[in-house]
């Protein structure tokens, strides 16, 4: 079974061109299923899988405390895997028939108000190279709506500061050109001039924009650790995740009159329905404003 999973992952890399993070997610999901089957019964041939095996796996995942979102992702990964095996002639039937994806409550993105954004963006210690780097990263995230993966993968050739934009390769290897505001440009230029040269190390010749204290490119996990520290320092009580500034970027644009198609393009969403969730956020925030300030609310 593990060999078949390896073949599938290779197919996703070579034929589908999926990102490393997506490949890892598929790998984790499928090996989680295999580990369950190892405790359930001996599985040597995927063609012996039945609907009851999938139902049992879903029950097992729920019992382990997996969220409906996680279970839905497992089911999606298995569907893709079995479809590949059937197309490749390694399975003759689909055990996923009549398996329904668990319904998920749609959670709205967590968004910071403008005061909290200011607190967060001013909480880095800019007297140090690492502090300047951190402020520049946060300013760019809020100014552009980049995903964290896109941020840490930025290279020097992606910056076009004199022209006022940056370019990035997003999901599906799609290139985006994103304007960069004056504040973010100023902070980024200061980081590049004063801090980045101090973080570079001769042994690591890379052109990543944002470097760690070893002179290597930052990872998503490294950024997450940095963000947690800054969020704590800011005193903001709301939970803040790496996606919070992206959500805030989109919501604040819509609140100030940006059209949905433009926000979709800036975020790099393939489907506008993904962007539409932010319109629900702005409606809820308008209701809060109404309740707070209208005399008869």
UniProtKB/Swiss-Prot annotation:
<feature type="active site">
    <location>
        <position position="269"/>
    </location>
</feature>
<keyword id="KW-0159">Chromosome partition</keyword>
<dbReference type="InterPro" id="IPR044068">
    <property type="entry name" value="CB"/>
</dbReference>
<keyword id="KW-0131">Cell cycle</keyword>
<comment type="subunit">
    <text>Forms a cyclic heterotetrameric complex composed of two molecules of XerC and two molecules of XerD.</text>
</comment>
<comment type="similarity">
    <text>Belongs to the 'phage' integrase family. XerD subfamily.</text>
</comment>
<feature type="active site" description="O-(3'-phospho-DNA)-tyrosine intermediate">
    <location>
        <position position="278"/>
    </location>
</feature>
<feature type="active site">
    <location>
        <position position="147"/>
    </location>
</feature>
<keyword id="KW-0233">DNA recombination</keyword>
<dbReference type="GO" id="GO:0003677">
    <property type="term" value="F:DNA binding"/>
</dbReference>
<dbReference type="InterPro" id="IPR004107">
    <property type="entry name" value="Integrase_SAM-like_N"/>
</dbReference>
<protein>
    <recommendedName>
        <fullName>Tyrosine recombinase XerD</fullName>
    </recommendedName>
</protein>
<dbReference type="InterPro" id="IPR013762">
    <property type="entry name" value="Integrase-like_cat_sf"/>
</dbReference>
<keyword id="KW-0238">DNA-binding</keyword>
<keyword id="KW-0132">Cell division</keyword>
<dbReference type="GO" id="GO:0005737">
    <property type="term" value="C:cytoplasm"/>
</dbReference>
<dbReference type="InterPro" id="IPR023009">
    <property type="entry name" value="Tyrosine_recombinase_XerC/XerD"/>
</dbReference>
<keyword id="KW-0229">DNA integration</keyword>
<dbReference type="GO" id="GO:0006313">
    <property type="term" value="P:DNA transposition"/>
</dbReference>
<feature type="active site">
    <location>
        <position position="171"/>
    </location>
</feature>
<dbReference type="InterPro" id="IPR011932">
    <property type="entry name" value="Recomb_XerD"/>
</dbReference>
<dbReference type="GO" id="GO:0007059">
    <property type="term" value="P:chromosome segregation"/>
</dbReference>
<comment type="function">
    <text>Site-specific tyrosine recombinase, which acts by catalyzing the cutting and rejoining of the recombining DNA molecules. The XerC-XerD complex is essential to convert dimers of the bacterial chromosome into monomers to permit their segregation at cell division. It also contributes to the segregational stability of plasmids.</text>
</comment>
<keyword id="KW-0963">Cytoplasm</keyword>
<feature type="domain" description="Core-binding (CB)">
    <location>
        <begin position="1"/>
        <end position="86"/>
    </location>
</feature>
<dbReference type="GO" id="GO:0051301">
    <property type="term" value="P:cell division"/>
</dbReference>
<feature type="active site">
    <location>
        <position position="243"/>
    </location>
</feature>
<feature type="active site">
    <location>
        <position position="246"/>
    </location>
</feature>
<dbReference type="GO" id="GO:0009037">
    <property type="term" value="F:tyrosine-based site-specific recombinase activity"/>
</dbReference>
<dbReference type="InterPro" id="IPR011010">
    <property type="entry name" value="DNA_brk_join_enz"/>
</dbReference>
<dbReference type="InterPro" id="IPR010998">
    <property type="entry name" value="Integrase_recombinase_N"/>
</dbReference>
<dbReference type="InterPro" id="IPR002104">
    <property type="entry name" value="Integrase_catalytic"/>
</dbReference>
<dbReference type="InterPro" id="IPR050090">
    <property type="entry name" value="Tyrosine_recombinase_XerCD"/>
</dbReference>
<feature type="domain" description="Tyr recombinase">
    <location>
        <begin position="107"/>
        <end position="291"/>
    </location>
</feature>
<dbReference type="Pfam" id="PF02899">
    <property type="entry name" value="Phage_int_SAM_1"/>
</dbReference>
<dbReference type="Pfam" id="PF00589">
    <property type="entry name" value="Phage_integrase"/>
</dbReference>
């Amino acid at each position: 079974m593990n060999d078949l999973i390896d073949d599938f992952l290779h197919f996703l890399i070579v034929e589908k061109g999926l990102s490393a993070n997506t490949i890892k997610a598929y790998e984790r999901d499928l090996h989680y299923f295999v580990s369950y089957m190892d405790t359930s019964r001996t599985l040597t041939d995927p063609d012996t899988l039945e609907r009851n095996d999938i139902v049992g796996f879903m029950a097992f995942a729920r019992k382990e405390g997996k969220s409906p979102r996680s279970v839905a992702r497992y089911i999606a990964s298995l569907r893709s895997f079995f479809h590949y095996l059937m197309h490749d002639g390694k399975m003759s039937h689909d055990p996923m028939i009549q398996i329904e994806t668990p319904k998920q409550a749609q959670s709205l993105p967590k968004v910071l108000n403008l005061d909290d954004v200011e607190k967060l963006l001013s909480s880095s210690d800019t007297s140090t190279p690492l502090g300047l780097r951190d402020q520049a990263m946060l300013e760019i995230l809020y100014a552009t709506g980049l995903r964290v993966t896109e941020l840490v993968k930025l290279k020097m050739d992606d910056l076009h500061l004199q022209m006022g934009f940056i370019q990035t390769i997003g999901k599906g290897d799609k290139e985006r050109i994103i304007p960069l505001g004056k504040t973010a440009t100023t902070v980024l230029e200061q980081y590049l001039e004063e801090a980045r040269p101090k973080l570079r190390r001769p042994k690591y010749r890379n052109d990543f924009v944002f470097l760690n204290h070893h002179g290597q490119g930052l990872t998503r996990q490294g950024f997450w650790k940095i963000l947690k520290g800054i969020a704590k320092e800011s005193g903001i009580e709301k939970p803040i995740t790496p996606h919070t500034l992206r959500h805030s970027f989109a919501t604040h644009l819509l609140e100030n009159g940006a059209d949905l198609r433009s926000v979709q393009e800036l975020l790099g969403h393939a489907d506008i329905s993904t962007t539409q969730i932010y319109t629900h956020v702005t409606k809820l925030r308008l209701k809060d404003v109404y309740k707070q300030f209208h005399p008869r609310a």
